[in-house]
Amino acid sequence: MKLDNGMASKTKRLRGWCFVIVAAAATNGFTTALPAAPVDAQAIADHFTSIKSMSGDFVQSGPKAERTSGRFFLQRPGKIRFNYAGQWGISVIADGKSVVVYNKKLRTSRLYSLSKTPLKLLLDNKVDLSGSRLKSIREEGDLIIIKLSDKSSFGNSNISMMFDRKNLDLRKWSLIDEKGLTTTVTIFNVKQGVRVAEGTFTIDYAANRENNTSTKSR
């Protein structure tokens, strides 16, 4: 399949944003800071992980102000799905073990281990803030920002989770890639405690192998 330069460039950028979601690895992000008043980071994390399922809309902003949007579904432990709007049929799916970035139109997919991505920190039944995982916590406007990393699992990657200061609900998160570039996902129209349709988080491993074999043979 041949794509005109404009369409090919747009598709490449979108795949890149998806890649940042699942494979971020960097060192810097927010400057470490303490809030003016004490904030219990573990209490906020426990509130977040008490929500076992949710769905809603999202807007993703890239390092060059690129924006895309879609729907997401989350179920603990370890499962999330992003369906990106647009003709390419791009989705990101975590099934508790792996994460796949899938382009339905081009029949391409990229598979990663969930345990090696910052998404794991969002999807665990409990956010573990022990050791050196908690890098900073601070207040900024109506948000409380908690920055986390886990060097033993995914190197110098980090994720900053931003919670509503009033009700402690998650509003957005930012991931940093290996070049120090930030991608932010903002969620809204969120419903908690939802029932998610069967198959939402299913990864077709056979299709993934076939897609990758076909790609290599082109």
Predicted ranges, named:
Residues C18-G29:
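Bacterial N-terminal signal peptides
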Residues S130-S132, E139-T213:
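Gly/Pro-enriched, hydrophobic low-complexity segments
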Residues D46-A65:
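A short, Trp-centered hydrophobic/proline-enriched beta-strand micro-motif
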